[in-house]
Amino acid sequence: FLVYDPENPRWEGRDRFFLDPGHMSPMLYSTLALTGKFTLDELKEFRQWGSPTPGHPEVDIMRGIENTSGPLGQGHTFAVGAAIAAKFLKARFDEVMNQTIYAYISDGGIQEEISQGSGRIAGALGLDNLIMFYDSNDIQLSTETKDVTVEDTAMKYEAWGWNVLSINGNDP
């Protein structure tokens, strides 16, 4: 569903996908491999020193990686910034720059204050060109999320002005 030009990965009008939890890089690399951006041999080098497939992705526009992952919440913030920039470009150049920005975030990342601020500003600005996939599996690095937070994330985002759609990702 991403609009992009495989012959011109740097095309400014492309949709963008930002991965917040870098540990989900196998998902990203395998998807990009299906588009020819990585070979099976490169996937086999996952997390090896000097590999093109490190444990946390590093920006490589030519291969479809829009952001280097680092502190949790950073990918969420990159996506919000890109959505703001895309809105500016669309206002200036109309449909030529009609981009959709996608982000994949996780329970651990959503707890970070940088992510909270991004969520608030995106809702306040009404960024309808930003779609965020939130992996709400109630697990973070070393514990269940209920051990550190009791908030209803969907309600919080709705209060910030987001259109929230809840999907049971475990429904066979």
Place the predicted regions along the sequence by residue.
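Cofactor-binding active-site loop characterized by glycine-rich and histidine/acidic residues
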Residues: F1-L125
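Glycine-rich, histidine-containing beta strand-loop boundary motifs that form or position
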Residues: P21, I105-S106, Y134-S136, N168-G169
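General structural signal for secondary-structure boundaries
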Residues: F38-E42, T149, P172
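Gly-rich Lys/Arg/Thr-decorated short loops/hinges at beta-loop-alpha junctions or inter-strand turns
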Residues: H56-I65, M97-I101, I131-L141, T153-W162
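Conserved thiamine diphosphate
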Residues: A91-M97, T145-D171
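A short, conserved beta-to-alpha structural element at the edge of catalytic cores
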Residues: E112, A122-T149
